[in-house]
C-alpha cells in the first residue's frame, strides 16, 4: 500500500510539473477584456475569452477558444464567434490594458506635462481629459468605446485628475491663482 501511494504521489507531482505551466500560461494569455472588430457589424466590440476553458483545453493539448462575454450580447449571442481569429492571431495586441499602456506610454499628462510610467488597473488610475474639460478615469469608459474616446480625449495623471475633480466638484473651495511662470 505504501509503495503504491509513493508511486501515485510521484506520478501526480510529475503530471502537475508538466501540466501546471501549460494551464497557467494559457489562462494568463487569454484572460482580460479585449477589443476586436466584429466581423458581422465591422464595429468595435469588447469581448472576454473563456480563459478557464482555454486553460483546460491547453492541458488536453487543444487550443479551442470560446467567448465568455461580448458587448454585442445578448442580441448577437448566436454569432459564429469569428472574432476569435483576431485573438488567436495576436492575443496580447487586442488586450485593453495593452492598448492603454501603449497609448499612455507615448504621451505626457495634458495638465502638468509629467510622463506616464505605467498604468494601473487598480489604485491610482490614470484618467482622461474630455474636450469639455472634465476628467474621467479610463476605467469608467466602456471598453467597446475606448478607441473612439482615446481619439478625442487627452491623458491625465492621477494627481491632476484628483485635483481637477475636486476643483470641478467644489469650486467654492478653490482659489484660482495666476501662474508664477
Where are these regions (language model features)?
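Transmembrane-cytosolic junction motif
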Residues: 14-43
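Short metal-coordination and nucleic-acid-contact micro-motifs, chiefly zinc-binding Cys/His arrays
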Residues: 31-34, 66, 102-106, 150-153
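Short cysteine-rich clusters marking metal-coordination/redox-active sites
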Residues: 38, 67-70, 109-112, 154-160
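Cys/His-rich microdomains that often coordinate metals
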Residues: 42-45, 74-77, 83, 87, ...
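Short cysteine/histidine-rich metal-coordination sites, predominantly Zn2+-binding motifs
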Residues: 51-62, 85-92, 97-102, 124-138, ...
Amino acid at each position: 500500500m505504501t509503495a503504491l501511494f509513493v508511486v501515485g504521489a510521484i506520478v501526480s507531482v510529475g503530471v502537475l510539473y508538466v501540466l501546471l505551466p501549460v494551464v497557467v500560461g494559457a489562462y494568463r494569455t487569454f484572460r482580460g477584456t479585449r477589443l476586436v472588430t466584429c466581423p458581422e457589424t465591422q464595429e468595435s466590440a469588447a469581448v472576454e475569452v473563456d480563459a478557464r476553458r482555454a486553460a483546460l483545453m491547453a492541458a488536453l493539448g487543444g487550443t479551442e477558444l470560446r467567448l465568455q462575454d461580448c458587448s454585442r450580447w445578448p442580441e448577437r449571442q448566436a454569432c459564429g464567434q469569428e472574432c476569435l481569429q483576431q485573438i488567436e492571431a495576436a492575443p496580447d495586441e487586442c488586450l485593453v490594458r495593452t492598448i492603454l499602456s501603449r497609448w499612455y506610454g507615448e504621451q505626457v499628462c495634458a495638465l502638468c506635462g509629467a510622463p506616464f510610467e505605467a498604468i494601473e488597473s487598480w489604485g491610482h488610475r490614470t484618467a482622461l481629459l474630455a474636450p469639455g474639460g472634465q476628467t474621467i478615469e479610463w476605467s469608467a469608459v466602456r471598453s467597446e468605446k475606448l478607441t473612439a474616446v482615446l481619439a478625442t480625449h487627452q491623458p491625465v495623471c492621477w494627481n491632476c485628475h484628483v485635483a481637477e475633480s475636486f476643483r470641478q466638484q467644489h469650486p467654492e473651495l478653490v482659489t484660482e491663482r495666476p501662474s508664477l511662470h
